[in-house]
Structure formats: structure tokens, C-alpha cells
UniProtKB/Swiss-Prot annotation:
It comes from Mouse mammary tumor virus (strain GR). This protein is coded in the long terminal repeat (LTR). This is Protein PR73 5'-endogenous. It is a single-pass type II membrane protein. Residues 1-48 are cytoplasmic. The chain crosses the membrane at residues 49-69. The lineage of its organism: Viruses, Riboviria, Pararnavirae, Artverviricota, Revtraviricetes.
Amino acid sequence: MLLVLPRLQQKWLNSRECPTLRREAAKGLFPTKDDPSACTRMSPSDKDILILCCKLGIALLCLGLLGEVAVRARRALTLDSFNNSSVQDYNLNNSENSTFLLGQGPQPTSSYKPHRLCPSEIEIRMLAKNYIFTNKTNPIGRLLIMMLRNESLSFSTIFTQIQRLEMGIENRKRRSTSVEEQVQGLRASGLEVKRGKRSTLVKIGDRWWQPGTYRGPYIYRPTDAPLPYTGRYDLNFDRWVTVNGYKVLYRSLPFRERLARARPPWCVLTQEEKDDIKQQVHDYIYLGTGMNVWGKIFHYTKEGAVARQLEHISADTFGMSYNG
């Protein structure tokens, strides 16, 4: 009878203990007089491997063709939808509000190209809208207006021009302009500008900002801000403090900032505050009482005075010692 063991046990058994397969169980494993090619039949021949490779190749080819057909069908559908849609011109002139179709450029032969396809009319109009309405004198905006009016320009020409212009603008940004030039440039845009030490300052609301540093309205003024050392807890139970008028979560402060805000620096405390902290530490160590910060404030309220009187009375009544 064949002894069937789990695979791991079979693997780690000694050869002496491993039962030899006999009779029916050993059929096809070892060459015998009746069946000399038994062991070679178990491994695939070169012919089998070749057939398998051919099948895999054909399957991959079919997948690729299917993908190509799907991409072409999708492209045809999108082009039809663009041609059927009546896209209104972005009022470049008040008198001019025409609908026209830009001729699609030559389509690439295969969808597996590393570069982007030619941009659609919608994309170009969105680009034009963004560039024209941010700044009328923008060279890219002017180029796009010209392009929208002149349909004969090819897409490749237009977009190489746009890239060149953008690179030129980037290079101009990198060159440091003098503060005077910055002031003149910003004054032209109708903002209230003044000259700072290192750069221009723009007035937004009632504060002066360096260009690029404005992050929305100035929320927390010094009167409204939480105490700089203790901070407050928001609705998510996150501790926060204000930094330059903005709410900053305590955990997102750099380590040194957090360390500095743990308590006021010792040198800025008055002698009374220093003695109070020392007394609190002494009580905490020797008397085992909790360091009650609000206790001192509570003592000076009416409720606090009543509570202290009650504590004194109860201590006298029940013979308990009171450490005030």
C-alpha cells in the first residue's frame, strides 16, 4: 500500500525512510522493458516549447491589434464630436463672435508614439483663454489670438513657437530684475506698490506682501491669536499656534520651534513666575500632587473662594491635612 505523506515531510525524509513507489504508482516514472521512453515523456520536447512560443506570440499580436483598433475608434469618435459641437469663440473682440473649425493636423500612423498627439481645438481655446485673460500684453496670448484668427498655421509651428516663447519668459524670470523695474511692472497692473529693501511690496488688504508670499486673507491677528507658547486645540483636537498670522499645527512646526514653544524661555519669566514653577515641581515630586496650572487662576474667582472655604471646612471636620 502506498504511504502518502505531506509534501514537506516527503521532502525532508531520509532516502532510507522514503517508500519506493512500486507497481501501478511507478508507471511512467522509470524506463522499463515494456516502456523504454517513460522518463523522457515527462519533460516537454523542443517541438512542444516552440509550439507554445508561437501560440503566445499570436496571442500578443491579437491583443496589440485589438488595442490599435480601440484607439483608432476612440480617436474617430472624439474628432466627430469636436466637429459636431459648436464651440463659441472666446470674445476676442466684442464685435467678433464666430464659430469655426480648425483643421486637424496630420494624424500619426500608430498610437504607440512617445510624443503627444496634436492638441484639440478645445485645448487650444482653453490655452488662449488662460493666456489672454491673465495678461493682455502676454506674447503667448497674442500668438494664440493670431492663431485663432489665422487657420492656415499648422499646429506644430504654433506649438514650437509657444515653447520658444515660454522658454524665453522663463529665462527672463531667472534674470534678477532690479527693484525699480519690478515696481514699474507692478504699477502698470494697477496695484498699490512700494519699494522694499530686497524686493517690491504689494498692498493687499491692510498689509504689505512680497510678491509670491500672499496665501489668502490674514486670518489671525495678534489679538485673536492663541497664546504663542500654549497654543489652542482645534475641533480635530490638534494643538495649533499662529505663525505670521497663519494657523500652523503644532506637530508640523520644526523641532526647534516646538522646543521653544514648550514653555517660555526661563530668562523672560518674572521672579514670581520662576518661584511658582519651582514650587509646582517641588509639590509634584515630594507631595505627589498634580501640577494644576488653572488652580491659581481659579483661586481668584468667587467660585474658587467658595470651593477653598468648603475644602478647609471639610478638612477640619474630617481631620484631613490640607496642602494649599
